[in-house]
Every structure is written in structure tokens, then in C-alpha cells.
Amino acid sequence: MLIGIYIAALLLGYLFGSIPFGLILTKIAGTEDLRSIGSGNIGATNVLRTGRKGLAAATLLLDALKGTAAVIIASSFGGAEAAMLAALGAFLGHLFPVWLKFKGGKGVAVYIGVLIGLFWPGAIVFCLLWLATAVTARYSSLSALVAAFITPIFLWWFGHPALASLFAVLTLLLFWMHRENIKRLQAGTESKIGEKK
């Protein structure tokens, strides 16, 4: 019975996470295919490169909310363990959506969204770290990497070892998805916030 619940939670999370809101919103707005501009990513940062700040904000919000919703729904029928599996599923769904031949986003908004659903103070810490790094360095990718690196440590320090383990895995995946950004940061060629590629 529990195995069935856990599988359902993982699949629920994956299906929620795989909804490509950035692509959907930009198509509705009549902009060019998001995958053909900037980084080719379907997330909010690349939507911002279209010059449509409202669309970028909506993408960020909806990508976060799909993670939060998956966690809350899974928690309602399967408890904390199911919620964590839904979080993992949502993150994987965003990174590797079946609808887009498994080529999705980099996961920052969904990371925040599932963190809101599982332990909202952690999401506040993540956002504050992101903001502080963004203000000082003006690199969206670096801001996300710094915040994601510290988040599992914060969760462990405040007595949530299971969540710390989950977010350590999510952080590793997030770093992998940002591997090209890391190379550009090292080379000094990464685009700053507000710049078009």
C-alpha cells in the first residue's frame, strides 16, 4: 500500500513539474519560441531575455507554485515521505519533461516551490541568499548556486536531516544543470541580470 502511495506521489510530482509554463506563456503572448533565444532554456531567466518582465515574473511564480502544489497534494494523501517524493518528482519533471523530449529548465523556481511546501523558512533563506548575491554580483546563475549550496546546510543545522538529504540531491542536480553557466562564470563570459545574450 505504501509503495503504491509513494509511486503515486512521485508520478504526481513529475507530471506537475513537467508543465512548461515559460514556453506556454510566451507562446500565448506571441513571442518567438523560447527555445530559440538566449540560453534556449524554458525558465524565467530566459523569458526575461524576451524583454517581457511580466511574463518572466509569471513564469517564475507558476514554476514555483507547481512544485508547492505537488508537495501539498502528496502530503494530504501520503504524509511527509510522499511530500518529499513529490518534491523530487516535480524537480525531475521540470528538468526532464516528457513533453519536450526531456529538455526542460534548470530548476531554480521549482526548487524554491518545493521548499515552500516542505519547509517555508528554508525558502525565505534561499530567496534572501539569492537576492544578496544578485545585488552584489548581478549573476542570476551564481545567485542560485550560492543559495542552493547553503540551503541543505541550513536544513541540517536546524534539525531537518531528511530534508537536508533531499535538497543536497536537488542541489547536485541543479549544479549539473548549470554546468555551462559555471564554465562561463569561470571564463568571465556569463550574462549579468538584465543583459540579453
From Swiss-Prot:
<dbReference type="GO" id="GO:0043772">
    <property type="term" value="F:acyl-phosphate glycerol-3-phosphate acyltransferase activity"/>
</dbReference>
<feature type="transmembrane region" description="Helical">
    <location>
        <begin position="54"/>
        <end position="74"/>
    </location>
</feature>
<dbReference type="InterPro" id="IPR003811">
    <property type="entry name" value="G3P_acylTferase_PlsY"/>
</dbReference>
<keyword id="KW-0812">Transmembrane</keyword>
<comment type="pathway">
    <text>Lipid metabolism; phospholipid metabolism.</text>
</comment>
<comment type="similarity">
    <text>Belongs to the PlsY family.</text>
</comment>
<keyword id="KW-0444">Lipid biosynthesis</keyword>
<keyword id="KW-0594">Phospholipid biosynthesis</keyword>
<keyword id="KW-1208">Phospholipid metabolism</keyword>
<dbReference type="GO" id="GO:0005886">
    <property type="term" value="C:plasma membrane"/>
</dbReference>
<protein>
    <recommendedName>
        <fullName>Glycerol-3-phosphate acyltransferase</fullName>
        <ecNumber>2.3.1.275</ecNumber>
    </recommendedName>
</protein>
<feature type="transmembrane region" description="Helical">
    <location>
        <begin position="153"/>
        <end position="173"/>
    </location>
</feature>
<feature type="transmembrane region" description="Helical">
    <location>
        <begin position="80"/>
        <end position="100"/>
    </location>
</feature>
<dbReference type="GO" id="GO:0008654">
    <property type="term" value="P:phospholipid biosynthetic process"/>
</dbReference>
<comment type="subunit">
    <text>Probably interacts with PlsX.</text>
</comment>
<keyword id="KW-0997">Cell inner membrane</keyword>
<keyword id="KW-1133">Transmembrane helix</keyword>
<feature type="transmembrane region" description="Helical">
    <location>
        <begin position="112"/>
        <end position="132"/>
    </location>
</feature>
<keyword id="KW-0472">Membrane</keyword>
<dbReference type="Pfam" id="PF02660">
    <property type="entry name" value="G3P_acyltransf"/>
</dbReference>
<comment type="function">
    <text>Catalyzes the transfer of an acyl group from acyl-phosphate (acyl-PO(4)) to glycerol-3-phosphate (G3P) to form lysophosphatidic acid (LPA). This enzyme utilizes acyl-phosphate as fatty acyl donor, but not acyl-CoA or acyl-ACP.</text>
</comment>
<feature type="transmembrane region" description="Helical">
    <location>
        <begin position="5"/>
        <end position="25"/>
    </location>
</feature>
<keyword id="KW-0443">Lipid metabolism</keyword>
<keyword id="KW-0808">Transferase</keyword>
<keyword id="KW-1003">Cell membrane</keyword>
